[in-house]
Amino acid sequence: MAASRTATRTLRALRTSTRPALTAAPRAAFRQGGRRLYSSEPAKSGGSNIWAWAIGAGALGAGGLWYLNQDGASATPKVFAPKFDDYQAVYNEIASRLEEKDDYDDGSYGPVLVRLAWHASGTYDKETGTGGSNGATMRFAPESDHGANAGLKAARDFLEPVKAKFPWITYSDLWILGGVCAIQEMLGPQIPYRPGRQDRDAAGCTPDGRLPDASQAQDHLRNIFYRMGFNDQEIVALSGAHALGRCHADRSGFDGPWTFSPTVLTNDYYKLLLDEKWQWKKWNGPKQYEDKKTKSLMMLPADMALIQDKKFKQWVEKYAADNELFFKDFSNVIVKLFELGVPFAENSERWVFKTVNA
């Protein structure tokens, strides 16, 4: 834990003033185990003030609330339309919790917050216009029980105290803001964000099978991502998120991290794909690869498909050679993913939040 935190702070100190140009060195060490938080009770709010949704996000552009300040028998309604500073405050709270709560994989909840935002968005289907980040329907079964979403309760629970402190923000906007914050605080590129997502009930749950299956190859990847409206270059750029986090045998069945610095976003994922020698892992789990040198890293069949397919591989090579290009393309495509199917108000603007600990 201490080594992981020290390495992260060292990387932060070595940053240049131009964020996209950063090429972070791999961490010397990262925490292999530790207590994992899988569930927690939502924080309870108190006091005499009542927050109630009265105006939808579309009506006010960035959302709106009636704030009922009860004083005895009287109640004075006020319209609250959150602005940039309000969302920056939410961002700051998430960043603060990321710094304080180090009882998760490799000392950070950052990667699992990115995964939550990704999986909430990656259910979009352009033909039917269903799915996507608008709704936060993973709060409900059956979507919460989909195999691809195993372990994401930890991320949802991590954000519950933030929701309690800022009850005006929708879960849909909060989950995406959590992903944006995590990427930026893990030394990634700036990720423009705009609010306007509205929560839905269980009727909006998407069918199982819309998220990528890591055991599959390039044809499956194209079927999944083309359905959302992505091209080959965007598929490879989005895959760069695998620089973060690790797989768990009790969730996906796979096990291990992709990179030596799983809480720092760099282009190391692409470099390792090309530079390391990969072999099948001999174990009782599903088929996955391990690096021949240390046997401590893993790649999944869907990862290896990126260098087995010529059209994919050209982009792997470009991103491995140019971290700035990767950051630029990753930022563009993750914003596209996070906004799929969201009925934003006309002329709504994107914001870039100031980092707190990065």
From Swiss-Prot:
PROSITE patterns: PEROXIDASE_1 (PS00435), PEROXIDASE_2 (PS00436), PEROXIDASE_4 (PS50873)
GO molecular function: cytochrome-c peroxidase activity; heme binding; metal ion binding; peroxidase activity
Signal peptide: none
A Gene Ontology term for the protein's cellular component: mitochondrial intermembrane space
Co-factor binding comment: Binds 1 heme b (iron(II)-protoporphyrin IX) group per subunit.
Catalysed reactions listed for this entry: 2 Fe(II)-[cytochrome c] + H2O2 + 2 H(+) = 2 Fe(III)-[cytochrome c] + 2 H2O
UniProt transit peptide range: 1-38
Residues the UniProt record annotates as site (Transition state stabilizer): R115
EC number: 1.11.1.5
Coiled-coil residue spans: none
Localization: Mitochondrion matrix; Mitochondrion intermembrane space
Gene Ontology BP, a term: cellular response to oxidative stress
Span list, region Disordered: 192-214
EC category name: oxidoreductase
Amino acids binding heme b: H242
UniProt keyword list: Heme, Iron, Metal-binding, Mitochondrion, Oxidoreductase, Peroxidase, Transit peptide
Residue positions of the active site: H119, W258
Main location: mitochondrion
InterPro entries assigned: Ccp1-like, Haem_peroxidase, Haem_peroxidase_sf, Peroxidase_I, Peroxidases_AS, Peroxidases_heam-ligand_BS
Cofactor or coenzyme needed: heme b
The protein's assembly and partners: Forms a one-to-one complex with cytochrome c.
Biological role: Destroys radicals which are normally produced within the cells and which are toxic to biological systems.
Protein family per UniProt: Belongs to the peroxidase family. Cytochrome c peroxidase subfamily.
Record-linked PANTHER family: CYTOCHROME C PEROXIDASE, MITOCHONDRIAL, THYLAKOID LUMENAL 29 KDA PROTEIN, CHLOROPLASTIC-RELATED
Name assigned to this protein: Cytochrome c peroxidase, mitochondrial
Source organism (scientific name): Neurospora crassa (strain ATCC 24698 / 74-OR23-1A / CBS 708.71 / DSM 1257 / FGSC 987)
